Each structure stands twice: as C-alpha cells, then as structure tokens.
C-alpha cells in the first residue's frame, strides 16, 4: 500500500489538556508513525505517516478530541516519506 505522510498544525484548546498523549496513543493503536509536539504559540504540530485509511482515521480521531481538547483551526501539508519507526511525543 502507498504510504501517506501529513503534517498538521492544530490550534484551539490543545495544550494542557492531555492532547499530545491522546494523539500518541491513538496513532500507536492504529499503527501510524511520526510525532506530536507543542509549539511556543500554543498550537500543536503532528507529523504522521501510514496508509491512507490510517491517516484518515487518525485525523478523524484528532478532530473528535479527547473530551478536553477542542480544535478551532488547522493547517495541513502533504509531506514526502519520513523515516520514523514509531510514534512519539517530541519536546
């Protein structure tokens, strides 16, 4: 299957609410690789790779949130293949 890589920068209530660990747990559960990272401006960056279905499922779950997070806006960029072996939180 063709590998898809996306970079999302999400804004809203996404820091201080367990969002990064939520994203990490969802990504690992569905087999996506990459990372999630808090940014200084209060947004969160997510780089994720997997097959098309995995990426769509991750995005759907991210937009649903963890019950405390709320995404008001986001940017999406297609990326070339990245070399991550797992999904982790970057600091």
Swiss-Prot record:
It catalyses: an acyl phosphate + H2O = a carboxylate + phosphate + H(+). InterPro entries: Acylphosphatase, Acylphosphatase-like_dom, Acylphosphatase-like_dom_sf, Acylphosphatase_CS. Pfam families: Acylphosphatase. It is an enzyme of class 3 (hydrolase). Keywords: Hydrolase. GO terms for molecular function: acylphosphatase activity. Signal peptide: none annotated. Residues 5-91 form the Acylphosphatase-like domain. Its EC number is 3.6.1.7. The keyword Repressor does not apply. It comes from the Bacteria. The active site is at residues 20, 38. Gene3D superfamilies: 3.30.70.100. The keyword Hydrolase applies. Belongs to the acylphosphatase family. This is Acylphosphatase. It comes from Fervidobacterium nodosum (strain ATCC 35602 / DSM 5306 / Rt17-B1).
């Amino acid at each position: 299957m063709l590998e898809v890589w996306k970079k999302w920068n999400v804004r809203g209530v996404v820091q201080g609410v367990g969002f990064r660990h939520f994203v990490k747990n969802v990504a690992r559960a569905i087999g996506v690789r990459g990372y999630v990272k808090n940014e200084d401006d209060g947004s969160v960056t997510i780089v994720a790779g997997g097959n098309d279905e995995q990426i769509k499922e991750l995005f759907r779950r991210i937009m649903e949130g963890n019950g405390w997070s709320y995404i008001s806006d986001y940017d999406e960029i297609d990326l070339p293949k990245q070399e991550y072996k797992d999904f982790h939180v970057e600091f």
